[in-house]
Amino acid sequence: LFPYTTLFRSVKSLERARNAGIPAVCVSPKDYESREVFNDALLAKVKEFTPDLIVLAGFLVKIPETMVHEYSNRIINIHPSLIPSFCGVGYYGLHVHEKALERGVKVTGATVHFVNEGMDEGPIIAQKAVAVEDDDTPEILQRRVMEQAEWLLLPQAVDDIANGRICVVDGKVKHNK
């Protein structure tokens, strides 16, 4: 079983996890008087599960540095662009696709990366490009990036890590042969 932690009480995945017998909890910053108290609570909850790998998807909160250090090269994130484009503070969800269309890029995509102290700055595990069409809206582009890149990259990255096919050397991901 893979424990599931979310920031949002109303997400369908929380219900799905519980229905599948997967331990599921909500640790939301809204429930704590400060970010520091939330960070401590999040780390404590994660430690209870003793995870080998932490997978972030739509986790719109910067991971506390204490947690990044505790789980160095064991936290991964999926980002809906080809990092280093359209990433960092303020680039999440639909905003990423709005900015890509405003800029007029012809190709966008998704990136799976290890989480470090920076925002979308960790070693890149995998990327997949997706074409941008002339008549795209942010919503259409977001859907295409999810279907053609994110939903493929993330499970493959988890599988590669779980089976020892990748490692981080000098701040870069290397694929073991």
Q: What residue spans do the PLM features occupy?
A:
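Donor/substrate-binding cores of folate-linked one-carbon enzymes
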Residues: 53, 57-171
